[in-house]
Amino acid sequence: MFYKQDWILRQIQMIGEMISMAVFHKSIIAYENENVVSPTQTDRLYTRLDMLVANGKIGEAEDALFDEIDPDDPKYLELALDFYQKLNRLSDAELEKYDFPRQEILDGMNTLVELFGLSDLVK
């Protein structure tokens, strides 16, 4: 089981890095609020996702992400990559505690790839 989890963790990292380099020309994605005084829709979603994850509601956070995501706006891709990279940094014990297996993170990353038309990057 440990090897499978480790393999999934590396797959998530690799997919995130490939998308980051291809789309944003940087190896690490960290979403940054565009305007603290007048937050954008992605800024508000980012804050909401962070609060949900902090309260252990990871599944609800992922649902909110996909409810609001706009595949025509690269800011949503940046936000989603940041979201999944943060989840991937959680320990297996934390993910298990919140009933969110690491495989779901990989599934979410693969859904992003499809939504944003990036399948050719991740073959």
Regions found by a protein language model. Name each.
Residues M1-D73, R89-K123:
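N-terminal alpha-helical interaction modules that lie
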